[in-house]
Amino acid sequence: MDARATIPEHIARTVILPQGYADDEVIYPAFKWLRDEQPLAMAHIEGYDPMWIATKHADVMQIGKQPGLFSNAEGSEILYDQNNEAFMRSISGGCPHVIDSLTSMDPPTHTAYRGLTLNWFQPASIRKLEENIRRIAQASVQRLLDFDGECDFMTDCALYYPLHVVMTALGVPEDDEPLMLKLTQDFFGVHEPDEQAVAAPRQSADEAARRFHETIATFYDYFNGFTVDRRSCPKDDVMSLLANSKLDGNYIDDKYINAYYVAIATAGHDTTSSSSGGAIIGLSRNPEQLALAKSDPALIPRLVDEAVRWTAPVKSFMRTALADTEVRGQNIKRGDRIMLSYPSANRDEEVFSNPDEFDITRFPNRHLGFGWGAHMCLGQHLAKLEMKIFFEELLPKLKSVELSGPPRLVATNFVGGPKNVPIRFTKA
């Protein structure tokens, strides 16, 4: 065993295995212990390759802003166990990536492909969507209010609003949104028994990997026809932009276009719904914060940022060292794998006072919920806008909100958040 592997096994298992993320009272104390005792250290647990775990805000930023040294392309950017990793490579010709998305690229390739939609996702561009987003938000708020005082915020509201927004932006017909919801949940839910299409107590790693591959294939089959359609009949949507984009004078290969579609459809939906659910949990547990937001709508953008920080819907991304280097006094060797922990970075006491508290007055809020560096979330401005509009529409119509039962969290070390948020509310 590598002498640098110093993290106690029970701590390492908590922060590496998906199950640890299903309980905030387990995962956050483990991260605090690491920040205090071993902020950057290597871990070995059965079934996973050795990895460094970066838990400090400064280290996650330092690694994230150096794509030339810490690569997304060299190894999988998703934390897989060894069985999943082997299966993914077996179906992709030895490549560590199942889809050729932005998150699996390094500059200059990443720069070129990200540049195709960069302007579309800038604040000035997405303002044209505001009227339509507000209409969708108003319908979603009314849907919630129609439950007449009690509902599950996630399954009755939060899953559908961001899905409708991002599918509208992408250009997916509204009738196909249920399919997109299922595929998105399958994409992020391979570790979650409740999200499995196969009615089995628990999938083996190989079964989970096969289902993931099947989900990708279904996504690609669905999107293939749209590329042809948008080239002959372009519309004002992201699919039309990508279908008609060229690099070096040629249309983009279908595998890259489809991967782009999948990335927008999945990341643009699940992260926003998770953060919205986190916001409702925070407001329910802290009624004084709800009163503040209702009395001063100017605080709603801060509410949005605090929800992203506090919920941290992206749990981890992986990097691979391209050369020997040093971070926080630790010798990182070429080929070493590093897990970047965004939930831990977002609760770093050196950056955030009272980091475990949900505080919508927190400013500045230097959270890393949207990542950092070249791979910082492309759709962050759209996500912030849709959450801002949603709470602008919802809060004036609420007198109070409280949890009517314990929230349940998704068990995932990749992307996820609240799975169920049962609430009781009174209308204003």
Curated annotation (Swiss-Prot):
Transmembrane segments: none annotated. Its cofactor is heme. Belongs to the cytochrome P450 family. This is Cytochrome P450-terp. Keywords: Cytoplasm, Heme, Iron, Metal-binding, Monooxygenase, Oxidoreductase. Its main location: cytoplasm. Its EC number is 1.14.-.-. It comes from the Bacteria. Signal peptide: none annotated. Heme binds at residue 377. One of its GO terms (cellular component) is cytoplasm.
